[in-house]
Curated annotation (Swiss-Prot):
EC number of the protein: 2.7.11.-
Cytoplasmic side: 282-646
Active site: 448
GO molecular function, one term: protein serine kinase activity
Assigned keywords, A-Z: ATP-binding, Glycoprotein, Kinase, Membrane, Nucleotide-binding, Phosphoprotein, Receptor, Repeat, Serine/threonine-protein kinase, Signal, Transferase, Transmembrane, Transmembrane helix
Sugar attachment sites: 33, 69, 73, 133, 153, 167, 187, 201, 243, 247
Transmembrane regions listed in the UniProt entry: 261-281
Biased composition (Polar residues): 621-640
PTM annotation (Phosphothreonine): residues: 482, 487
This protein's name: Cysteine-rich receptor-like protein kinase 3
Residue ranges of domain Protein kinase in the record: 323-578
Gene designation: CRK3
Membrane topology: Single-pass membrane protein
CDD domains: Gnk2-like, STKc_IRAK
Length: 646
């Protein structure tokens, strides 16, 4: 391909609209200035994780939610809300995106005890005090677009914007805290939206929007303005940025015939066009980072061509019936997966990636670059990709039984897994992970081992899927330091608290998965007062009754000695100290009976003993480094952070 064409392709990928965009791009991330002591950090982080785990289903169910978790000065107050013009799908996606960013304010990152993230589609906040009735705070922001209106339309635009701001502050209160509309006079249109958070009563909404109207006045000659307050959100723009426009207009005579509407939540997908000027700004301000991303995209394109991995975007559209909901197999924080049938009759799984931020580049590059270079019976096989359409697509072999999570906890039309199948699934998963860690040409940490990422073939051979969060592990490092990414409940304590990543983080995740499969129960360590299945198994192990933890649906139809051995291995994998967890190759040998099983010496994560251990880990410098200097040059620092809701 000519170099000019390739460059145009790359630029097009950065600025093309995506039908999957949910206005999730961050407008502002604000971390407060209240710090916490090292002794309290682990408990505060634990309460934060539980609160985040609990607030997500509330937002998914009704568009907003608040959660209080913990006691005393370690209490975490959490809140999330979507802008009311978003449909449910876009609300869920938007919230997943900003939820991934708020941990950057956590004590192990910034040393603070509160933070909030504003996007143009949703909002999230956590703090160590009850902020639910706040209308204003010292951290409120006014954000004006850098470009001003010029020429003969400047005065008209300013007047229209001022009128619209007045309309929004009045009509939103009348309409239950939400208003979206526009003013169009003298052929100049200004669009706007205002919303009070559900935590405010009517008087609080009036106060918040009244103050927002004053603050946004400083932006009236700019192309766009926003006010980000503790109790409300207000925005105007030259562009229509909301869904299903209302009819709030002013006629050319300057009358006051304003009709406010509450926009209905729709099933349409949000189209959020990245402006060319914004793309140019990013290219100038982040030149080095864009060069890296271009290099990655060029590598992807050459890799796809060299290995015959290229698929036509149009063919994949037709194969999935244009991404019909009836063909949808599932959705995570990085994209949706659809069943498709190619023209040759082959059934495939097509992953449709969301790429409205830099994150899609890393995720897509990881998937194609890593999984195309590994080959194992327990890894999902990548068949190809498409990077020539409006969004990036990955094509995998189709696994009929879907995920282990669905088979255990969702599907009601299947027989429960018997003991032999559970053993086969656990062993196959362990063998696949041992290959990734030690046997492949690359040293790969998956970072997101969980039930929903284990797919099952017809004969129940497990396949490890989703390499979007995977990391290559340098041969000359004992660990790398990275922002946390993964799934709550499966992440190792040293990774949650310090961002310290080794293969042993995957081992911990495997241990959780292993115990979940054997017990038929999910690990609820991050749900307040729910208890942890890891703690339950440990307690039974201490009293020599560990076989009682086996899924009761099996009755007596399982090998008690074998079950006890596997649960003991699971406990070894979830020990609080990472250096006491076995390597995956050792796990495989212990499962096959060719190696003695050691005795766990520590309780699993989140019981009192492990909390003490976490405190020690946070207060003690790391000693397991590639040299004794302790220099930060021993680390590779990664900036991205990504959570997928469970």
């Amino acid at each position: 391909m000519p170099i000019l064409t390739l460059l145009l392709l790359i630029l097009g990928l950065f600025i093309s609209p995506s039908v999957s965009d949910s206005r999730g791009d961050t407008v502002a991330q604000i971390c407060n200035n209240r710090t916490t002591t090292p002794q309290q950090r682990s408990l505060f982080v634990t309460n934060f994780l539980a609160a985040m785990d609990a607030v997500s289903p509330l937002v998914e169910a009704k568009g907003y939610g608040q959660v209080v978790n913990g006691t005393g000065n370690l209490t975490v107050y959490a809140y999330g809300e979507c802008i009311k013009d978003l449909d449910k799908k876009d609300c869920d996606l938007c919230f997943a995106q900003i939820k991934a960013k708020v941990p950057r304010c956590l004590p192990f990152q910034k040393g603070t005890r509160g933070g909030q993230v504003f996007s143009d589609g949703c909002y999230i906040r956590y703090d160590d005090y009850n902020f639910y009735n706040e209308t204003l705070s010292l951290q409120d922001r006014t954000v004006c677009a850098p470009k001003e209106i010029t020429g003969v339309n400047r005065t008209v635009f300013r007047d229209n914007a001022a009128e619209l701001v007045k309309n929004m502050s009045v009509e939103a209160v009348r309409n239950g805290g939400f208003y979206a509309g526009f003013v169009d006079r003298h052929n100049v249109t200004v669009h706007g939206l205002a919303q009070c958070w559900e935590t405010l009563n009517r008087s609080g909404c009036v106060e918040c929007l009244s103050k927002a109207s004053v603050r946004i006045g400083s932006c009236l000659v700019n192309e766009e303005g926003r006010v980000l307050s503790a109790g409300c959100y207000m925005r105007f723009s030259t562009q229509k940025f909301y869904n299903n426009s209302g009819n709030s207009t002013s006629d050319g005579n300057g009358g006051h015939n304003h009709l406010g509407v509450i926009l209905a939540v729709t099933s349409s997908v949000v189209a959020f066009v990245l402006l060319v000027s914004a793309a140019g700004f990013l290219l100038k301000k982040r030149h080095a980072k864009k060069q890296r991303e271009k290099k990655q995209l060029g590598s992807l394109f050459m890799l796809a061509n060299k290995s015959n991995l290229c698929f036509s975007y149009e063919n994949l559209e037709r194969a999935t019936d244009y991404f019909s909901d009836k063909n949808k197999l599932g959705q995570g924080g990085s994209g949706s997966v659809y069943k498709g049938v190619l023209t040759n009759g082959k059934t495939v799984a097509v992953k449709r990636l969301f790429f409205n931020t830099k994150q899609w580049v890393d995720h897509f590059f990881n998937e194609v670059n890593l999984i195309s270079q590994v080959d194992h019976k327990n890894l999902v096989k990548l068949l190809g990709c498409s990077i020539t359409g409006p969004e990036s697509l990955l094509v995998y072999e189709y696994i009929a039984n879907q995920s282990l999570h669905d088979y255990l906890f969702v599907r009601k039309d299947v027989q429960p897994l018997n003991w032999a199948k559970r053993f086969k699934i656990i062993l196959g998963t362990a063998e696949g992970m041992a290959y990734l860690h030690e046997e492949s040409n690359l040293r790969i940490i998956h970072r997101d081992i969980k039930l929903s990422n284990i797919l099952l073939e017809d004969d129940f051979t497990p396949r490890i899927a989703d390499f979007g969060l995977a990391r290559l592990f340098p041969e000359d490092k004992t660990h790398i330091s990275t922002a946390i990414a993964g799934t709550l409940g499966y992440m190792a304590p040293e990774y949650v608290v310090r961002g310290k990543l080794t293969e042993k983080a995957d081992v911990y995740s495997f241990g959780v998965l292993m115990i979940e499969v054997i017990t038929g129960k999910r690990n609820n360590a991050f749900v307040q007062d729910a208890g942890s299945i890891l703690q339950s198994v440990w307690s039974l192990y201490r009293t020599s009754n560990v076989e009682e933890a086996v899924d009761p649906i099996l009755g007596d139809n399982f090998n008690k000695i074998e079950a006890s051995r596997l649960l003991q291995i699971g406990l070894l994998c979830v020990q609080a100290a990472f250096d006491q967890r076995p390597a995956m190759s050792v796990v495989v040998k212990m499962m096959k009976g060719s190696l003695e099983i050691h005795t766990p010496t520590q309780p699993p994560f989140l019981n009192p003993g492990s909390v003490v251990e976490m405190r020690k880990m946070m207060m003690t410098p790391t000693t397991n480094q590639s040299n004794s200097s302790g220099s930060r040059s021993d680390y590779i620092t990664e900036g991205s952070s990504f959570f997928e809701p469970r």
